[in-house]
């Protein structure tokens, strides 16, 4: 992989449109990955299965740390957006919390399959957004993301309740139950992997 900072030559910055079409960014050579630019021009908040405008109507620039290129605009959210997301999660939990373990496991496996199918694209997006080497995204971050989804898809199948005899007239039993709606703040170290660390086990356990 090749990286060029904001100090790249003017000649490189004025590369032809044909050359630009072979790469997703002037800072990153991804021609060998055969992927298109992974971002749309603007993103709202993903709530209840679709992108929606932020309540404030405001957006901010998402800039790649590789060379300070703007890669897209992102919703500037506030507490009203959080409330909307919480409402959607509580509504989804009514059904998801009652979904049987086999179904939850199969859905997690499908998520892993989709991630694996789009590994090159997601690794490119992670690299541009995060600034880390594309080879690290390709060889470490994304494979670990996929593996975590499959791991928890398997683990949940082995989760069972238990009964313990305390005395000849007393028994103790436990039944795993989802907590409900949970939240997560994702730092910038490796966003997709850190999100997966929390999302996969939470969804596997029936939380939203």
Q: Could you describe each region identified by the protein language model?
A:
Residues 162-208:
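Conserved small-residue-rich beta-alpha loop and adjacent elements
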Residues 49, 68, 104, 149, ...:
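Residue-level signature of catalytic and energy-coupling elements of molecular machines
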Residues 2, 51, 173-174:
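Short Gly/Pro-enriched turn/cap motifs at secondary-structure boundaries
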Residues 69-159, 169:
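Glycine-rich loop-to-alpha-helix module at the N-terminal edge of alpha/beta enzyme cores
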Residues 5, 54, 64, 76, ...:
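Conserved strand-loop elements at the edges of beta-sheets that form or border functional pockets
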Residues 13-66:
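Hydrophobic face of amphipathic alpha-helices that form TPR/SEL1-like repeat modules
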Residues 1-12:
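Single conserved hydrophobic/aromatic residue that forms the stacking wall/gate
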């Amino acid at each position: 992989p090749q990286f060029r900072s904001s100090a790249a030559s003017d000649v490189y910055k004025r590369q032809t449109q044909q050359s630009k079409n072979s790469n997703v960014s002037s800072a990153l050579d991804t021609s060998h990955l055969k992927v298109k630019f992974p971002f749309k021009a603007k993103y709202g908040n993903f709530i209840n299965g679709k992108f929606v405008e932020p309540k404030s109507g405001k957006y901010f620039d998402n800039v790649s740390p590789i060379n300070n290129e703007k890669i897209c605009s992102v919703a500037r959210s506030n507490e009203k957006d959080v409330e909307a997301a919480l409402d959607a999660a509580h509504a989804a939990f009514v059904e998801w919390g009652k979904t049987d373990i086999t179904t939850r496991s199969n859905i997690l496996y499908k998520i892993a399959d989709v991630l694996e199918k789009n590994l090159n694209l997601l690794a490119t997006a992670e690299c541009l957004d995060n600034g880390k080497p594309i080879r690290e995204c390709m060889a470490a971050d994304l494979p670990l993301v996929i593996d975590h989804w499959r791991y928890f898809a398997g683990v949940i199948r082995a989760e069972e309740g238990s009964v313990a005899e305390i005395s000849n007239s007393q028994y103790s039993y436990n039944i795993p139950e989802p907590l409900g709606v949970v939240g997560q703040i994702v730092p910038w170290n490796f966003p997709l992997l850190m999100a997966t660390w929390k999302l996969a086990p939470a969804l596997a356990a029936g939380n939203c």
